Amino acid sequence: MEEIQRYLQPERSQQHDFLYPLIFQEYIYAFAYDRGFSRSILSENPGYDNKSSLLIVKRLITGMYQQNHFLISPNDSNQNPFGARNKNLYFPIISEGFAFIVEIPFSLRLISCLEGKKIVKSQNLRSIHSIFPFLEDNFSHLNFVLDILIPQPVHVEILVQTLHYWVKDASSLHLLRFFLNEYCNWNSLITPNKASSSFSKRNQRLFLFLYNSHVYEYESIFVFLRNQSSHLRSTSSGVLLERIFFYGKIERLVNVFVKVKDFQANLWLVKEPCMHYIRYQRKSILASKGTALFMNKWKCYLVTFWQWHFSLWFHPRRISINQLSNHSLEFLGYLSSVRMNASVVRSQIIENSFLINNAIKKFDTFVPIIPLIASLAKAKFCNVLGHPISKPVRADLSDSNIIDRFGRICRNLSHYHSGSSKKKSLYRIKYILRLSCARTLARKHKSTVRAFLKRLGSELLEEFLMSEEDVLFLTFPKASSTLRGVYRSRIWYLDIISINDLANHKSKF
């Protein structure tokens, strides 16, 4: 049993990963910058970030070498601890370097799993790609759902302590702690505002990594819920062993929870065979076929678990209980709900015929049309009612360049929302973009839309549809004959992680 428990424990780093010397290597920052630059696929003109030049990196490393944190003088009160006069200039560089360095032990562990040196455990399913089978699951038999807003740590020290279980290099952790305390306001990092001039999307990588490591510890207590209902569940005995060890964790937690007044921990609470769990960013969903009382017990359990195990204040209002038949799940930029599909069946017995009305529950995932139209209206592609309008463009842009920009936006939206079961809203978005493109070109040439489309022919339509044919051929080579198959099938693309800004409907078009 001890061997089983040792295997099922969250994998920790058993060796000392000496990461501290890497902080002073120039190539680390070059790799970090190159990775962030190559992933900016949504920006039209990424350009070159002059704040990440090699000369500035050399000055930063020299300043860190020469800085002595044990010597404190009155003249150093306004001095930057890393030898930098401009905090906003050096903060993104250090953040990118730290993010690249602390991910090294996790990357090495993943590579060893892929090479077959270790068994790939269920924790590896906790990625953005595990959301796809979750949305494909059959929810029609479920009754209630918990919408959970995961609390954020009140202090960065909690994050550093969590990372200490994985990385045993004390020097790098001390420097990371010093950097976070000196530069960072945790609340503004998780929920950045427009007034923060030193904050950018690329600088979020380090803090999201620390936050996800923290949530990983929280999810380890009931990760088996995702395995049971997922299409990715393992067929080996690993899931059974994991569940046995999970009950052992719950029994140990009972000794803690019984100290709370009016609280009783029941093991049957976590033995419900039909539970669905998934998380994306700070929001998680827990669905079950249980009763309202059953879900209230889960709510009480989660609140107590956060407060006692993580020393975080978790307000009960962060968890809402909703009946699935009257509630839509907002997740990953999709809306999912259980709907009643009515059907009429004619039954005939000898000379008598009967009409039988059947109501079948169906779980549908569709595109949230209202937020998308609001985003398009904000970007001047249409008005608030969804009517396409012309977009002002520079006079030096060629027609092919304008068509390519509109087509790229349309392809990204179509690519991202291709997993929806209802395509009608997606057709409307594509219609808005296509007509807006035509009106923009007609405005540039001082012509009417009808005359311009007649002169342009099918070129504009091919630009908006050609990419879908190519993707269909790569994904389903046996069904690439008709375009109709694209609209009816549900396709989940694995590179959706690169364009997940569309989930927040705040993408800059």
From Swiss-Prot:
InterPro entries named among the record's database cross-references: Domain_X, Maturase_MatK, Maturase_MatK_N
Pfam families for this protein: Intron_maturas2 (PF01348), MatK_N (PF01824)
GO-annotated biological processes: mRNA processing; RNA splicing; tRNA processing
KW Plastid (keyword) present: yes
Top-rank taxon, per record: Eukaryota
GO cellular component terms given for this protein: chloroplast
GO molecular function: RNA binding
Keywords per UniProt: Chloroplast, mRNA processing, Plastid, RNA-binding, tRNA processing
Subcellular location: Plastid, Chloroplast
PANTHER family, A to Z: MATURASE K
Family note: Belongs to the intron maturase 2 family. MatK subfamily.
Known role: Usually encoded in the trnK tRNA gene intron. Probably assists in splicing its own and other chloroplast group II introns.
The protein, known as: Maturase K
Organism of derivation: Jacaranda mimosifolia
Gene (UniProt): matK
